[in-house]
């Protein structure tokens, strides 16, 4: 009997849904540290003699309380009064941590009345309520950046330098944040876990992580001469995807240029020597750029963005970059920036590279034009130039990213079976970024604008 009572009142208790730890335990006041595993549920019950006060420490909770339901996030607070039926589910893909404070005549486990309305089917909760969500970016202050992203797009950033704006990113180095709808405030990767991989589209089924990153780049100064690895090397050595990318030139100063590929065959030894004697630029293709130019940068291709260029970059979701040469620049602490020469030499393509601007055909629509600017195994990017309105069909195979480069207007989402009924509607301006899960909906885009649309 004594042993049984010890286990019933132990400091840490394990349950089918996770565990809790008693931090404070008195007859009328109890504090618990509750951990619920992803997808698990504390099923519906109520208390007669106590109230509970929950604070979400981390994770995403789907809570049903007294006939109402909703999503709750970090720092949200929930009060559960005596006699009110409640149920909590971990709706994310990481542990849900709650601090629970109980106050009342009886705060023990005896004061718990189970009900018959429990459900463990997350899908039945219809957690995906919006057909499209607005994303706030993550910002980067690399030393070569400027402030054109603030000037062109009104990016609200306190950094003195705004080099990059990661518009759609689930990467751990910088995540976007959902900024509209019932998931507002969630980190993008948490949101993706909440809606489930099925809603990314079937082309994403083989990916362990979300596959695409979309960013804006302001190169006030030149970037380092660098190279990205392919998937095989990056997964083996960096535990992340490789990096193939496409550049769309949004704006540039006169006589701007970039470097892409070697202008002749070179050897590993020659590249190493030219890094040491500061002559590596002599064997790179120097390419003048104009607004609207598009370049695909295949993994293994040496490259560098020149000064005075604003670019939209669509890439694999990777932050894997190996610097070969950085013009002997020093960081804000006065130290030479790190180079990654050995790894760069491992992945470089030393053959002559013949750069080509991507110039796919333009398809005329009613009130708009479409131009495919990249189509590869990793992503498909389409520039939609809208004069008045565009009708874009959603697809089952992929999510859709919308990045507004110019103009303003509104995106209305309509069911293909009920095209006169608006499911969701959201306004936009230049610099805005949106994510739409897979669907067969119709996206009606109204307003003169220019938008890059990305799918897998």
Enumerate the language-model features and the residues they cover.
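Acidic/His-leaning functional-site neighborhoods
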Residues: 358-432
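An exposed, glycine/acidic-rich loop-and-rim segment of catalytic or binding clefts
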Residues: 125-126, 277, 283, 294-296, ...
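Transition-metal
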Residues: 1-18, 31, 110, 117-266, ...
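Short histidine-centered beta-strand/loop micro-motifs
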Residues: 22-25, 33-34, 42-47, 55, ...
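Short acidic-glycine-tyrosine-enriched beta hairpin
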Residues: 67-85, 284-296, 415-440
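Ligand-binding loop in jelly-roll beta-barrel domains
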Residues: 26-27, 73-74, 82-112, 217-222, ...
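Active-site glycine-rich loop that binds ribose-phosphate moieties when present
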Residues: 266-296
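Glycine- and acidic-residue-biased ligand/ion/polar-headgroup-sensing regions
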Residues: 49-67, 179-181, 191-195, 219-222, ...
